[in-house]
């Protein structure tokens, strides 16, 4: 059973995972209802989520400085907090690429990838919710395996998307911009897997 002070860390992890999930859902909504003229407004909304996630991470790091005893190793708390924050940062990074690369229309491959990002963030959120019971949880290992499976699915989708992009598109600027966007979408899932593997 976690001590009262331990609950702070687990609640912070849950909040961070929830910010990632909120960011993923927002990105999915933006991409599925794509309107390039509304990206600036969307960036502001996404940045508010990212800032809240950053604040939560700083709270965890500040608490670590003064903590005498922690529920898990300090290094693991810091690393997990960083990975959770990086998921949200990467999701925001996808939106930035859509904006500053001036993408004017959405590609179906990107929608498939963003759907995988949402699923991985949702599963990561469930996994993190089990951490406070890590010694007794019957679901934790299952969530880790499922996240690893989703990451492999993202890798396969990424490879197909890149192949499709490079074999059907002749404009090098379009290839470059989508190459970068697909890569950032795949990074989001990679960091969800890092959370699972920590």
Model regions: which residues?
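Cytosolic, long alpha-helical scaffolding segments
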Residues: 1-198
